[in-house]
């Protein structure tokens, strides 16, 4: 559904980032890419220097959807980026038949963290033409994300979001963990059990 800025030459990428440097109110620059996992050889010193040429805080969102995408070459490319001073976050799409089970998602998020990539967004599939076979229900997505809470640390948890059609932005859609009642809160844990807070006995 979009282009990839890292398919540009380092020269062209530097031209863009240097122009961003001149915009005073822009303090943070973020790029999104799949290049580190699909064409890791492109990630070299000139590209990394071009990414950082703005002199501003630079973040790179690495798009990956399955643990198998982390080839040795991809791992090396990611390490070059991090060691070169680029902060990495992740973006993944929840896809039926690809990563729609807790084990695969947990393994993917762990790999992100092991590669020094902070899990960021887990997208519900867009309504893009020709992709209906990848879509699953929001209810299933919510259940999968709830299942992650019992398997991986907080550092590895992504934010499950829906990008609303019509340009209305991204909205977190994980199932609500809390509900208010009688001045107390009923809080649901990762196993689906509900706990009263504060407890009735005050402990």
State what each model feature region is.
Residues 113-203:
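Auxiliary Fe-S-binding modules of radical SAM enzymes
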Residues 1, 61, 161-163:
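Extended hydrophobic secondary-structure segments that form protein cores and membrane-embedded regions
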Residues 3-152:
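Conserved AdoMet/S-adenosylmethionine-binding subsite of the radical SAM
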């Amino acid at each position: 559904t979009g282009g990839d800025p890292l398919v540009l030459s380092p020269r062209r990428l530097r031209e863009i980032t240097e122009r961003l440097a001149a915009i005073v109110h822009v303090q943070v620059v973020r790029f999104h890419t799949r290049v580190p996992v699909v064409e890791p050889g492109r990630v070299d010193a000139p590209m990394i220097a071009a990414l950082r040429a703005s002199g501003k805080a630079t973040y790179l969102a690495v798009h990956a959807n399955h643990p198998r995408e982390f080839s040795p070459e991809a791992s090396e490319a990611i390490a070059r980026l991090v060691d070169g001073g680029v902060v990495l976050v992740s973006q993944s799409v929840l896809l039926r038949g690809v990563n729609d089970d807790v084990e695969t998602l947990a393994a993917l998020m762990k790999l992100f963290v092991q590669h020094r990539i902070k899990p960021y967004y887990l997208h519900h599939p867009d309504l893009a033409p020709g992709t209906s076979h990848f879509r699953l229900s929001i209810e299933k997505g919510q259940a999968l994300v709830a299942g992650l809470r019992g398997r991986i640390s907080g550092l590895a948890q992504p934010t499950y979001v829906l990008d609303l059609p019509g340009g209305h932005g991204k909205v977190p859609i994980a199932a609500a963990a809390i509900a208010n009642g009688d001045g107390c809160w009923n809080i649901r844990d990762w196993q689906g059990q509900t706990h009263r807070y504060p407890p009735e006995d005050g402990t």
